[in-house]
Amino acid sequence: FLDHMLESFSKHSLIDLEIKCVGDTHIDDHHSVEDVGIVLGSLLNQAIYPAKGIERFGSANIVMDEACVECDLDLSNRPFLYHSLSVSGKVGQFDTELVEEFFRAFILNAGISAHIVQKRGSNKHHIIEAAFKSVAVAIRRATVKNDRIGIPSTKDVL
């Protein structure tokens, strides 16, 4: 399931991904999911900052059938995550509690301030996929090149 979410993230963020994760999945998927988030976030951080010539802010509302999830983010290099995804149990063999673990690891290591808000939805798969897509599209919009901006901060540093 995480592979499917990462493929969706890659497609909608326009960030090419090739990930191979070998972990202690004989215990559970927690460490592997968290580690993928840490590495992906760290690499995005290296690619973005000092964030010169990009928009910096991004938002996206993504609808997937009955589910609607909004992501608003700031490439501020001041990490913060708020989320209100209402999912529990499993999607297939994937523990839905790991969605928060992934986003927390990814967002904090990327240096992003993000609010991921479920506006509606009842199908866990749809809610989670809409969340991944909303983060992806918001990142794509925040990283649009704009050479007129310079460093997108009045402090001239991020």
Regions found by a protein language model. Give the residues of each.
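N-terminal intrinsically disordered, cationic/polar leader segments
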Residues: 1-158
